[in-house]
Amino acid sequence: MSTIPVTIDFSGGAEFLVKAKAQKVQIPADSTLRDVLKFVRDNLVTDVHRINMLLNDDASEVAHGVITLINDTDTGLLLEYDTVIEAGDTITFVSTLHGG
């Protein structure tokens, strides 16, 4: 199976749930954003007790309050979870939830 290089970036508090704020990883070629969510769950999340702050229960969607960007474009303007990821893409997860 061939793979492609991508960068996955976390901010707005989401970085506290994973190994590092920005990570260069290899994912299977032809992956969609939904596949990336599962990759994040299975390979990058370190705080499994608070994963619901980033992803829903089956990692098919991001949690409410998390904005997802591909190359700085909101995925709502693309094909959302069906967007095919390309080599060199940057996928960013931004949590908009803040305590107070």
From Swiss-Prot:
Gene Ontology terms, MF aspect: protein tag activity
InterPro entries noted in UniProt: Beta-grasp_dom_sf, Mopterin_synth/thiamin_S_b, Urm1
Positions of post-translational 1-thioglycine modification: G100
Covalent link (Glycyl lysine isopeptide (Gly-Lys) (interchain with K-? in acceptor proteins)) residue numbers: G100
Domain of life: Eukaryota
Pfam families listed in its UniProt record: Urm1 (PF09138)
Involved pathway(s): tRNA modification; 5-methoxycarbonylmethyl-2-thiouridine-tRNA biosynthesis
UniProt entry tagged with the keyword Glycoprotein: no
Subcellular location: Cytoplasm
GO biological process assignments: protein urmylation; tRNA thio-modification; tRNA wobble uridine modification
Keywords tagged on the record: Cytoplasm, Isopeptide bond, tRNA processing, Ubl conjugation pathway
Database matches in SUPFAM superfamilies: MoaD/ThiS (SSF54285)
GO cellular component annotations of the record: cytosol; nucleus
Modifications the protein undergoes after translation, according to the UniProt entry: C-terminal thiocarboxylation occurs in 2 steps, it is first acyl-adenylated (-COAMP) via the hesA/moeB/thiF part of the MOCS3 homolog, then thiocarboxylated (-COSH) via the rhodanese domain of the MOCS3 homolog.
Function: Acts as a sulfur carrier required for 2-thiolation of mcm(5)S(2)U at tRNA wobble positions of cytosolic tRNA(Lys), tRNA(Glu) and tRNA(Gln). Serves as sulfur donor in tRNA 2-thiolation reaction by being thiocarboxylated (-COSH) at its C-terminus by MOCS3. The sulfur is then transferred to tRNA to form 2-thiolation of mcm(5)S(2)U. Also acts as a ubiquitin-like protein (UBL) that is covalently conjugated via an isopeptide bond to lysine residues of target proteins.
Family membership noted in the UniProt record: Belongs to the URM1 family.
PANTHER family named among the record's database cross-references: RURM1 PROTEIN
Name of this chain's protein: Ubiquitin-related modifier 1 homolog
Organism, scientific name: Caenorhabditis elegans
Gene encoding the protein: urm-1
